[in-house]
């Protein structure tokens, strides 16, 4: 999920930031709307960076790692050092399960696996997740530190964070 928590600034901040570059002040709402559309259409993004947004999001860890790789932001993530992680894992939909691409090392084939093969993959993933979480709980029950017990958890485990961008 993605939930907007808070924001600072808005349309007025965006248009004022854009107009400062040519010394113009406040205009009408209609002109402001036109300017915002113009900025978006022509990819003039710096005025939009004047607005600060804070989101609460939840996603599998492997998605989270890709997300922050491509965007500079401030974030506070749930910590497996301080919290017992919930048993919630990502299992891809059957139509998203495909073989490794033969010509793209980073991707998969465009055609999904057969429904039968996809069902088998989903069952194997679920079984692996259940076993990993069972081991995690057993380690915690033995008194192993959370920061060590969590290493058995797969990247498909869901995480959540507050993510702030400008």
Predicted regions, residues:
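Family-specific signature for flavin-dependent thymidylate synthase
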Residues: 1-166
């Amino acid at each position: 999920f993605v939930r907007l928590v808070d924001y600072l600034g808005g349309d007025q901040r965006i248009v004022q930031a854009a107009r400062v570059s040519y010394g113009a002040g406040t205009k009408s709402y209609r002109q402001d709307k036109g300017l915002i559309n113009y900025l978006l259409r022509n990819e003039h993004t710096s005025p939009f960076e004047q607005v600060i947004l804070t989101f609460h999001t939840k996603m599998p860890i492997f998605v989270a790692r890709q997300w922050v790789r491509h965007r500079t932001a401030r974030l506070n993530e749930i910590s497996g050092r301080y919290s017992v992680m919930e048993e919630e894992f990502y299992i891809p939909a059957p139509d998203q399960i495909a073989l490794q691409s033969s010509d793209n090392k980073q991707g998969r084939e465009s055609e999904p696996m057969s429904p039968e093969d996809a069902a088998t993959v989903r069952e194997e993933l679920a079984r692996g997740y259940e076993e990993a979480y069972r081991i995690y709980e057993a380690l915690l029950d033995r008194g192993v530190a959370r920061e060590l017990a969590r290493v058995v958890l797969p990247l498909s485990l869901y995480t959540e964070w507050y993510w702030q961008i400008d």
